[in-house]
Amino acid sequence: MTSLSLVKKVIIGMLMCCFMLVNNIAGANPLPDPDTWAESACLIDAEDNGVLYGKDEDKIMHPASTTKIMTAIVALESGKLDEPLVITPEAVNTEPSSLGLRLGDKITLREALTGMMIVSGNDAAVAVAQTVAGSVPAFAKMMNDKAKELGAKNTHFVNPHGLTNYKHYSTAHDMAIIASYAMKKPEFRQMVNKQAYNMKYMDGHTVYVTTTNRFLKSGFYGANGIKTGFTNAAGDCLVASATRGKKTMIAVFYNDDYRWDDAPNWLEFGFSFYDKSELK
């Protein structure tokens, strides 16, 4: 073989490798960086929790009712889902939003937890905490222990519902990590993907509840959760999730007047990093 022929073969081989590389990348077509009005926001790929985009994602924020994602995690891992919910005057009198629990109601922890995630009931959050841990402070410790375990380093909980307390805080990045963990639990995914639900009481009657999450009802391809939030201190909050194929994106927005617009834009941006064949 002449040296010229060898050089030609090497060049052809290099060109073929380049073509294959470009062809693999060509399936992905990343969109322009998305805008947001959020004070803090974070987008992650739930497979490895890698941050795809963010805005002040490590800023300490009031998490409002996105807190209930951790409340659900701790409750789901308690082993008490089929036990009767403990409903105390403290729970019933908790500041709204409310699931409408009354003293004497008979309902399992599982059903109340589902209602809590759909309606964002603060009364249910307190009842869940007291059922699982005996008291709100004891439950908050369980929440903080779990946050530490998950690597949510800038998060501290003092209650299960997210009503404003300046010792109760998180970040968009931390909450994305927490939500990613939660979405790997099949029962959690079922709870937060419901637009409406007939909550079943132990005496046989049901109560129809509907979601506070407009994103879930938006028609966005793959939308499957997760949780809204609002307090005067926190502003409008949203943890949004969507799954296409084996890819799940999670976006968190804190203090965002345009959360319903930002969520689909950011999630679509996340999916644009991947070949369409991965999203089927």
Describe every region a protein language model picked out.
Residues 2-28:
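Sec-dependent N-terminal signal peptides of Gram-positive bacterial secreted proteins and lipoproteins
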Residues 21-22, 81, 203, 278:
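Residues in and immediately flanking transmembrane alpha helices
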Residues 26-173, 177-186, 244:
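Active-site-adjacent loops and short helices of periplasmic peptidoglycan-processing enzymes
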Residues 17-18, 42, 237:
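Generic recognition of cysteine residues
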Residues 8, 41, 51-56, 84, ...:
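A generic short-segment signal for beta-strand/edge and adjacent turn/coil regions
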Residues 152-153, 164-280:
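Domain-terminus/edge residues, biased toward the C-terminal soluble/receptor-binding domains
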